[in-house]
């Protein structure tokens, strides 16, 4: 299995180095739900600004404040403790009056707004995230500038970031140990982390192998293609290849890669054979996903940061702004720009 730091770069390995997250203010994330609260219902959606607090801890403190069980507080995604983040939490409070959230006290945390909502906010139920990042101590401004222009046009690999695999790859190692034993894992969080790490590692490996091909973005017979911004996909046939290629080139369609698991992978013929060969050596992780009945799915091979802009503060410091759809990683953008000093795994999704 190829480690995250050695996965194929779309624009070649960066020439220079830089520092990501010298302080929390260098990594700002704002959740984009993609909808507005209903204004009524048994749930309360809260938009919270936090710095120095992890999401689960804030959710637990909020549950105590509302005098409800911790399981009644949900969120769409984990956000980094060591960053400035705006995210939405959801509390189920049936039959209760609207609390006075001005009395909610937690250092580094502030309730910005709140409203009633009819439905629980579930994991992954957001449109995307807006990022403002500051990269410091950049050793090669010219190379970074060239790469930013290339990313604006050509995107980046849609890799799962190193943080998906845990500090030192602990989640992936946990998955491997679990796969090689028959012992049940009763901790639901561990199960989730380990299975996600296993499937994400296999996806990364498939993309890594495809990007080695000079014609990686050429549609082949049996490719699973996805309408940009949509979750469903369809299979390319040889008769349609010229027209489908035109739509891929215009970024109307995206070539996808497998999130392996049980059931059909989605590709057929030549494309399926390529994906199977790309992870043929990873039998242990594949067996785990089959054993635990994790359903196979698809994910776009490339990621195109939206609203990408940048501003050089000086020759060694640049501020980046961009928006990514839910499930995509800012660190996968940064790795195409600089060889980062620091550990990606400390940056939450």
Swiss-Prot record:
Substrate binds at residues 27, 129, 329. SUPFAM superfamilies: Pseudouridine synthase. CDD domains: PseudoU_synth_EcTruD. Its EC number is 5.4.99.27. GO terms for cellular component: cytosol. The keyword Nucleotidyltransferase does not apply. PROSITE patterns: TRUD (PS50984), UPF0024 (PS01268). InterPro entries: PsdUridine_synth_cat_dom_sf, PsdUridine_synth_TruD, PsdUridine_synth_TruD_CS, PsdUridine_synth_TruD_insert, TruD_catalytic, TruD_insert_sf, TruD_pseudoU_synthase. Keywords: Isomerase, tRNA processing. Residues 155-303 form the TRUD domain. It catalyses: uridine(13) in tRNA = pseudouridine(13) in tRNA. It comes from the Bacteria. PANTHER family: TRNA PSEUDOURIDINE SYNTHASE D. Responsible for synthesis of pseudouridine from uracil-13 in transfer RNAs. Belongs to the pseudouridine synthase TruD family. This is tRNA pseudouridine synthase D. It comes from Salmonella typhi. The lineage of its organism: Bacteria, Pseudomonadati, Pseudomonadota, Gammaproteobacteria, Enterobacterales.
